[in-house]
């Protein structure tokens, strides 16, 4: 019903958990988080333009590469089954999202990437409010085990890439 009402052109999922073969939703540590997870993966199965961004194998869209996830020992034991039109698999989902924003920035000739300072503040504030790092499960200023310096470095590199592309196209 929500798709009929809102009529989105595309659905994009970043680091959103999806059901595995047994219809349970698990985090990277294979904990069952079904009671705390919005079951939005269903929407992706009925829309014709979808993008999934994930890093651990348990996210919406990772069903596209389920067999490969099952073959590796460093990803989840219960991979997601949901599929998407386009999958962005990255070592950190945030970085995959930044990559998508960088590509869109170049396409429309405008830098859409968030400012590094803003991203640091968002991470720090969410941790203050109780968020935990997805890798360690601890309340620390990290994203999937990567500290703020490493996150900032990736984002700075993408800003440099986008800005150089925008300069050369003008």
What is each of the regions a protein language model found here?
Residues 1, 7-110:
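Conserved mixed alpha/beta catalytic, RNA-binding, or beta-rich assembly cores of soluble enzyme
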Residues 61-170:
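C-terminal functional extensions of proteins
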